[in-house]
Amino acid sequence: MLRNSKYTAEELWQKDHDHVIHPFTDFAQWDEKGSEIMAEAEGIHVYDTHGNKFIDGIGGLWCVNIGYGREEMAQAIADQVRAIPYYSPFNHLSTPPAGILGAMIAERTPGDLDHMFFGTGGSMANDTAIRFVHFYWNQKGKPNKKKVISRIDAYHGMTYLAAALTGIEFDKIGFDQADELVEYVACPYPYRRPEGMTIEEFGDWLIEDLEKKIETVGAENIGAFIAEPIMGAGGVIVPPEGYHKRTLEVCKANDILYISDEVVTGFGRLGHYFASEAVFGIVPDIITSAKGISSGYQPLSATIISQEMYDVMSIPQADGALFTTGFTYSGHPVCCAAGIKNIEIIDDEDICGHVRKVGPYFEEKLGELNDLPLVGEVRGKCFMMCVENVANKETKELLPPEVNVGGRIADHAQKNGLIVRPLGHLNIMSPPLTMTTEQIDEFVGILKGAIEATQDDLVREGVWNG
């Protein structure tokens, strides 16, 4: 019997299998495999219902920044439940945690991004950002500026509009899209840039591609450009030097708002509360944030806008209509209380400083995997990393999708106590930000062994010659 559960591991598996629809389910394997259920966690480790212990190399899902088992978080959440667990955020009503958290975040955002709308997840944050963009341009008397430019292989969520912003075609199979609102430009993917092109030339080509798209669609029809500072689910794509500054300049020149999707990069993953200015040197018009904002202890997100946007959006409408964007759980007091305590922990323990100090060591140790024949590139920054696996290091040719190389590596790693995320030919890592150098050594040792075991399997099966 599991601790704090009246059900056995087998009973929990069956209930989950029979009744829960999970995100990103492979129904070809679902009936047989079901879910592996994680029941407990502490620090950087999670434990399944059978008591097996794993290093959580994906931080829940890019989000458990402060690590698991924080008693002070549990206490803050419990205290808020006792005080007032919920009240309506509509019609000029609020609770104390929303304003406190808003002020704390405003102290840490770049520029004058001081106003924020709270939600419950990154998809909602990005959906809300587009609603704000449309409302803003309507208020400015430019109602045609509705289009949004996104990028191929970008990931911005899975609500109806956020799914359209997402540029990963595989994620859209079988679903209808709101694609008429979205235009896509090239992915800033240096490893797979056109053959014969230098990084500098590639950077120029990307900017030309954006400028051509704006010219084709018409700046008068484009409301915003949205970009992750480092692309997450698209493969941890770090753009060429100066890319974000140059895209922002193009947007400003064409009267287009700039949305920085910091759902993954925010709250310390790259060593700063927000990466837009501190890492990439830009101050966008909108920042969207979730995941690390509460370290996953409660569902929370924020759509953060500039003073100029707020000034325009807060002008009373001539017909007396209300600003009607809102959700039942916007500014939820328990979620906001978790966000407050999360920031206090990050500050008290200087977790951002820890990431700036230890993150380069994680990069260095993972970089040693480049010597393995199967590894084409190790990339990323600090605690946001990826290994791209290839059939041929020189040509960068991929193994056939049915080989499932990323999944094989992840399976070998998990058997030895490490969870990494497989995405086709990639393995993605986003561990809790509290990971130490000793834990990094263990992490990379297991991952190296998993890649080597996969290499041996592929050679033995005759699907790869090494």
Region locations from a protein language model:
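Conserved N-terminal phosphate-binding loop of PLP-dependent enzymes in the Aspartate aminotransferase
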Residues: 1-466
